[in-house]
Amino acid sequence: MSDLRRIRALLREVERRRARNSLAVYAGLHIPAEIEADDLPGLHKLSLPARYIPAAHHRLILEKLQEVEAGKIKRLMILSAPGTAKSTYASVLFPAFYMGRHPTHSVVCASQTQDLADRFSRRARNAVGSEIHRSVFGSGLAQDQRAAGHWETEQGGEYHATGVQPFAGRRADLFLTDDLIRGRADADSKIVRESTWQWILGDLRPRLKPGAAWVNINTRYNEDDPSGRILPKEAFGKSGWFEAKDGEKWYVLCLAAVIETPEE
């Protein structure tokens, strides 16, 4: 092996060791493969450089998600406009990293439909089942884990995907909710907003284990969406810690204010 190859191999090993403790480094090992055209409009994944450097708002997302993994934040709300790759980081790479760090834990990811939740699940499963993940954490996906909506780690940790619908038998150490309301039309429907809120009260909250973390990711189209029902009015358009209406202390990462027009 040439000196150059040895240096490259050493650098790869250093990167893998750093990735065990750093979500940002772990994400960097998977990207650009994990960035998709629908996350970054107009940018095809094959056109990305070999080493993707997260944008400033991505670094903020990664920083706060890392604090969730470390137990420093139990309630995190990420509010952002569409097309900012928030789901790639928060609903795909973060649960994969989290399950590498906590391979016996249970993760539930919910979205507006079962199909979208399954899509996040497949991508997270592929990350946990990758050679990259195994080289970082020394373990990975259990054998024969082909189901889109439910899979396990070798140590017995579980990942479950669901739409906004009743689900039984799953309790979570980490609960991810990603755009529970489909878009402006649904957000403007009082019936949809109320049914989504009742799902949160009746299905989500009872599934949180004691000490569990909840990360809510969404684009805001209506002030009466789930985020609006949780947060106090003084939190709108701001980032930081807030005492919420649900009696919990939430950290809000607001990357965009409430969207006022469909074009924004």
Positions of predicted regions on the chain:
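Short, flexible loop motifs at catalytic/binding sites
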Residues: 1-84, 88-264
